[in-house]
Amino acid sequence: MSNSAVSYKPIVNIENIVATVTLEQSLDLYAMERSIPNIEYDPDQFPGLIFRLEQPKVTALIFKSGKMVVTGAKSTEELIKAVKRIIKTLKKYGIKIMGKPKIQIQNIVASANLHVNVNLDKAAFLLENNMYEPEQFPGLIFRMDDPRVVLLIFSSGKMVITGAKREDEVSKAVKRIFDKLAELDCVKPIEEEEELEL
């Protein structure tokens, strides 16, 4: 079957967004620990305060410099909602917040399923910027330049994408790698493989 018969029908899921938030003011973490419930702060163990939200389910590490690291959001919208909820909670418990928080996405981790089988040996030989050592790790590691992401590609057609800064970069990367693998004749429909095993 030619690679043109392999259809593009991926399922892509954002698994985690890591972002930094800058408040441009210093924070009294001891005062926050005393007044806000369900906060963890042990400066002997870690310099930041740990703030967990249930809805959306994210964790924020808050530092006295006014910087935060927020993890766990599954979309940009969820990230913004979480930051707003954190700020609202801080204000509710008497922490004065001046100005608007500046949010910068540092990394988006996503998973994808191409619904094809990938010939990793062939892909490793034909693709540039890759590393494939199946005796060490079962996936092919591919470094893409545009968008600038790293993809872990498995023979099952499943993959992990890291390094994106925007959600649309994830979709673009998945489409580009699929097109490249199809062009190099490294993908086969799953049904074809299953028929060969019978």
UniProtKB/Swiss-Prot annotation:
GO MF annotation list: DNA binding; DNA-binding transcription factor activity
Annotated Sequence repeat ranges: 14-90, 105-181
Keyword Nuclease: no
Disruption phenotype: In vitro depletion studies show decreased transcription. Restoration of transcription requires the TATA-like A box upstream of the promoter.
One annotated GO biological process: DNA-templated transcription initiation
Domain of life the protein comes from: Archaea
Gene3D superfamilies for the chain: TATA-Binding Protein
PANTHER family: TATA-BOX BINDING PROTEIN (PTHR10126)
Additional remark text: Probably starts with an ATC start codon.
Purpose of the protein: General factor that plays a role in the activation of archaeal genes transcribed by RNA polymerase. Binds specifically to the TATA box promoter element which lies close to the position of transcription initiation.
Family the entry assigns: Belongs to the TBP family.
Protein name: TATA-box-binding protein
Species for this entry: Saccharolobus shibatae (strain ATCC 51178 / DSM 5389 / JCM 8931 / NBRC 15437 / B12)
Top-level taxonomy: Archaea, Thermoproteota, Thermoprotei, Sulfolobales, Sulfolobaceae
